[in-house]
Amino acid sequence: LADRLADAVAIGYDSLPGFGRPMARGHRGELILGMLGDIPAVMMAGRLHRYEGYRDEQIVLPIRLMAAMGAEILIVSNAAGGLNPFLRVGDLVVIRDHIDLAYRRGSYLSVGTDSPRYPSREVYDPGLIDVALAGARAGDFRAVEGVYLATLGPTYETPAEYRMMRRLGADVVGMSTAPEARVAADLGLRVLGLSVVTNVAKPERGSASADLPTTHDEVLAVGRGVVDKVCRIIDEVMRSGIV
């Protein structure tokens, strides 16, 4: 995605005070500034994760920096496991809401801001959700609304955990996104969340893939294959006049 920016300038996280270094493969650790059409944009090539030992305050620091730079919209994406039995590998799930099972007491909520400590609001912007779904229809590819569940990671879930998450109402599961999305909404940004379904959970014993492990290489391969879909949705957001 960062390759679509014109006049791009990349700044390594190691050059930015307070930024950590991503450890997950495929996460370069760069903040890239440039133009997306006629709109100034900042992209993160890599994110920090809780399972890497980073505190939520460190994970959301790039979001606070973007807000201070004048950002108005955050589009956040992730690779996720499909819990909903109707999902297929390669589908896009436009996040309607999330369940944060990895939240830790005293972390990122409203720290250092004047907003209420426990704000009650929609994290994901309904208008952006509608635009994203319209973009998928126009591009003739599959995208649905759903609930994202965040876990600590880095291990993938057991079959019993998959069943529990589905009963909680989650459609997809991953190891990121919730801290960034929540603090962005707390700072007044409009948030659009996109999950790429990179594997589908089939926890029932005897199902075709119940005993097949998910590998990080498989996740990366599927993620690379849906870049055009994500770009189409970003283009739709830009054309909509919301930006």
PLM region descriptions:
Residues 43-45, 74-78, 94, 143-149, ...:
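General beta-strand structural signal in soluble alpha/beta enzymes
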